[in-house]
Amino acid sequence: MYNVIFVLGGPGAGKGTQCDRLAEKFDKFVHISAGDCLREEQNRPGSKYGNLIKEYIKDGKIVPMEITISLLETKMKECHDKGIDKFLIDGFPREMDQCEGFEKSVCPAKFALYFRCGQETMLKRLIHRGKTSGRSDDNIESIKKRFVTYTKASMPVVEYLKSQNRLITIDAEQDPDAVFEDTVKALQPYL
């Protein structure tokens, strides 16, 4: 029913930037950001999860998977109703139970793009982004917590998908244009 590509990488690795560019170049793909879904729900008037999501994001913690999967699936259904079935899901799964839960209850991902980037580069990008993003989690304290969470919880997902030969690794240390060029080349066999 759905064709899903997970898009993984640490905070500030460039996942959102690259997904936006890919969705623009290949109009058959829709970019769904797990973080954006959570922030939208957090700010939606009357949301029963808003305050909970806000606390998790502020503390750099991973929001319970049932909430995130439900929000992602709702977005996917909305797109599917418009005839779109190819998705770049950015920033998800963040831990193994999310990966297993999504693949069991929604659909298996075809593969994952992993934007590999060092913490020093990601930190510089996030500090720069924090000046204009208005995101509550683009501050040094939250960023450091997000790095710890990412390393402990998300790297096992990367290793798991790699062990299943469902991982394409992209060097995200480069400038965004070079990263995009490498990503498009890596995706060619799947388009």
Swiss-Prot record:
Q: Which reaction does it catalyse?
A: UMP + ATP = UDP + ADP
Q: Which PROSITE patterns match?
A: ADENYLATE_KINASE (PS00113)
Q: What does the cofactor field's note say?
A: Binds 1 Mg(2+) ion per monomer.
Q: Key word Ubl conjugation present in the record?
A: no
Stretch list, region NMP: 33-63
What's in the keyword line of the UniProt record? ATP-binding, Cytoplasm, Kinase, Nucleotide-binding, Nucleus, Pyrimidine biosynthesis, Transferase
Q: Where is this protein localized, as stated in its record?
A: Cytoplasm; Nucleus
The family line of this record is:
Belongs to the adenylate kinase family. UMP-CMP kinase subfamily.
Protein name in UniProt: Uridylate kinase
Q: State the species of origin.
A: Schizosaccharomyces pombe (strain 972 / ATCC 24843) (Fission yeast)
